[in-house]
Amino acid sequence: MKKLEKDIKAYLKARNWHKLRPSDIAKSISIEAAELLELFQWQSLDIKETKKDKEKLEKLKGELADVFLYAIEMAVLLDLDSEKIIRAKLARVEKKYPAALMRKNKSEHGTQEAYLKIKQEYRAKNK
């Protein structure tokens, strides 16, 4: 991850983009995420169906890379350690949504219900 961050920092500096405002990068992340979402508009493809559609998969990889790049660019510009913040978030999510609880009901709908219940309880506690 450090090598990737270093490469992105050089990429930004070479284009004089190392002075971008975090608000502009946040907007770009949102725009690129919307473009990623647009690939699925009016469809409800599962993982298997998505993997089968090679054309969609190529477009998806491009949009996903855009989101990743902007997110890492923001971390680099703010001198944040991307790996460290991702691992910290993963640890918080592991506590918030324990695997055993999420696996309890094996149906997709049951897992979604458990997720939403946990999320609502969490938000109520943290108001």
Residue ranges, per PLM feature:
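Flexible "arm" and connector segments at domain edges
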Residues: 1-64, 68-127
